[in-house]
A protein has these predicted regions:
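Post-transcriptional modification and biogenesis factors for structured RNAs
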Residues: 1-155
């Protein structure tokens, strides 16, 4: 398999439908999806079908036990943490092929220790204060396609 365009990492995702939508985006652009356990759902065939992931066989993905395991496997990759606590906007980043886009769980976000470790590369999408957070799949799709836009497309 060729080198992934991006590495999309979901830290302890809770909702299978969000993971399914993000997986579909990864297939569409040639990104690899990493899932960090524990997950809020099972990865068996029945649950994947229920989440609409019938294309799962086309997805380059891996489930691992920790963020440190991802870093050990991808030591030289630049990490972008998506968090509402960031001061920089997604549009201010200059993405590179092979970057890691790290997203927290729907209910807890990313641990502060991970955000602090990558503080120079914490990014957010703009939103009014009355909105607590954006949907994980919507955010991931927006950020992935901003990177694709910066790359000049998929070619």
């Amino acid at each position: 398999m060729s080198e992934p365009l991006l590495h999309v990492v979901l830290y302890q995702p809770d909702i299978p439908q969000n993971t399914g939508n993000i997986g579909r985006t990864c297939v569409a652009v040639g990104a690899k999806l990493w899932l960090i356990r524990p997950l809020g759902f099972r990865l068996d065939e029945k649950h994947l079908r229920r989440a609409g992931m019938d294309y799962w066989q086309h997805l380059d993905w891996e489930a691992v036990d920790s963020w440190s395991e991802v870093r050990e496997r991808l030591p030289d990759r630049r990490v972008w943490c998506l968090t509402k606590f960031a001061s920089r906007m997604v549009w201010d980043a200059e993405f590179q092929r092979g970057d890691i886009l790290l997203f927290g769980s729907e209910t807890r976000g990313l641990p502060e220790s991970i955000r602090d470790e990558n503080s120079a590369n914490n990014l957010k999408l703009p939103m009014h204060d009355v909105v607590r957070s954006l949907n994980l799949a919507s955010t991931a799709n927006t950020v992935v396609y901003e990177a694709v836009r910066q790359f000049g497309g998929l070619t």
